[in-house]
């Protein structure tokens, strides 16, 4: 017996706020728009094959992968070289200051960053984080612990 899925719009409505908060925490407000759209486009394509046991963890896993894609793409961007480089003022930071917490989270090693974001910004259990990252539950727990420990050290230094 197969369990029928609710309509995709209902799925989107149920999870949009969680995905949005997770992506803003992961990639920042500006990039979150694009990642959000890509997340739900991918989710819509894969929706008929989704296992209904934990749809929230499933869509946050997709969001996590889109955030990783965003960071990979930023690393590949061409850098202009030459004497004719334009002088551009840094845009104002539209997000409120947070004492550098999110900058420090973004500076964590990728496995720790993913575990911390999924666990705390995504509010997933360690088991769900493990599934999202494709690691054991113990590895997910360890990565979150090590990431938090590193953040505490940096915040108190």
Where are these regions (language model features)?
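Arg/Lys-rich amphipathic alpha helix in sigma70-family domain 2
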Residues: 61-82, 94
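Acidic, proline/glycine-rich intrinsically disordered inter-domain spacer in sigma factors
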Residues: 2, 6, 74, 83-106
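A short, charge-rich alpha-helical start-of-domain segment used by transcription regulators
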Residues: 1-21, 113
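DNA-recognition helix of helix-turn-helix
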Residues: 64, 68, 133-157
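Short, small-hydrophobic-rich alpha-helical interface motif
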Residues: 19, 23, 32-43, 62, ...
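C-terminal flanking helix
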Residues: 20, 40, 109, 113, ...
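Sigma70-family region 2
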Residues: 2, 29, 38-55, 73-75, ...
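A short pre-motif secondary-structure segment
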Residues: 115-119
